[in-house]
Amino acid sequence: MSKDDKMPNLRREPKSQSQSALDSFTLVMQTYNRTDLLLKLLNHYQAIPHLHKVIVVWNNVGEKMPEEMWNYLGPHPVPVVFKVQTMNHMRNRLQIFPELETKAVLMVDDDTLISAYDLAFAFSVWQQFPDQIVGFVPRKHVSTPSGIYSYGSFELQTPGFGNGDQYSMVLIGAAFFHSGYLELFQKQPDAVHALIDETQNCDDIVMNFLVAKHTGKPSGVFVKPVDIRNLEKETNSGYSGMWHRAEHLLQRSYCLNKLVNIYDSMPLKYSNIIISQFGFPNYANYKNKM
C-alpha cells in the first residue's frame, strides 16, 4: 500500500476536539434542477438531531442559487452552506469541503426524504461501525461463469449462496460514512475519476470499492428504514433522476468490470446483516424494492 493510499484516521478523536464535531454529522446534498424540492428537504432536515451543518453542492451551473431566499426566511437552527460548482459532475459531492468539520458525513440525494428517527438510529449505528458505509439502500454484484460481473438489486440471486439475501454495497445517496474517505477518494487513480465523469455515474460504487479495499471487510452496513421516501414526482422541474435512464443498470455493470480491471481485484464482500430498530442485528430475507 502506498503512502498516499493509507487508510484515513478513523479512530475516535481526543476530548480536546469540539464535542459538537464528534457527536454530530454534516449533511452533504448535491442538487441539480430541483430548487423547489431542495427547499422542502432543507426545511425537513433542519429538525434532525445531531445535525451540525448542511453543505449544498449546487450543480445548476449558471443558475441562481436559492441562498438569498433561504436566508431571508430564517433564522434557521442549522447553518446551510451553498457550494457553487463550475461543472455538473457527479463526483462534485465527494470533494473535501473546508466547511466540513465533523467526522461523520451524511450524504443524501436531492429527491430523498429520510425520517428523523431513521437518521438518528442510523447515526448511532455508524458510531459503532465508523469505518463502513452505514445506509438504507443495499445493492450487490454477481459474477457469471465467464468472470463478468453484473450489478443488481438486493433480491438478485447470488451464485454459491443458499437461501437469504446478500448485499455487497450500500449506496451513498442515503448513508453515513467517515469524512476521511473523501480524502481517500481524491487519491484514487485518474482512471477511476475519468470513469465517473465518462458515465456521470458510479461514484457510489467507487466508494464501496475503496472502503472494502482498505478495510478488508464488507463495505457497508444495511440499516432497514422505517420511513424513507422518494419525492421526485413532487418537483415542478420535470427533471428525472439518472436512474431512470435505459442504460443506467448497464452502466453500473460496466463500471463494476472497469473498476475490477483498474484495481486488478474485486474487493467487494457479501454481507447479510440487516440492522433494524426492532431487533439488532436481524438476519432475514428482507426484500425492499427502492
Enumerate the predicted regions with their spans.
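C-terminal catalytic/acceptor-binding lobe
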Residues: 1-10, 16-24, 30, 36-43, ...
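Short internal beta-strands
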Residues: 54-59, 135
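A conserved acidic beta->alpha catalytic loop
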Residues: 58-67
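Conserved catalytic core of nucleotide-sugar-dependent glycosyltransferases
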Residues: 97-98, 108, 112-196, 200, ...
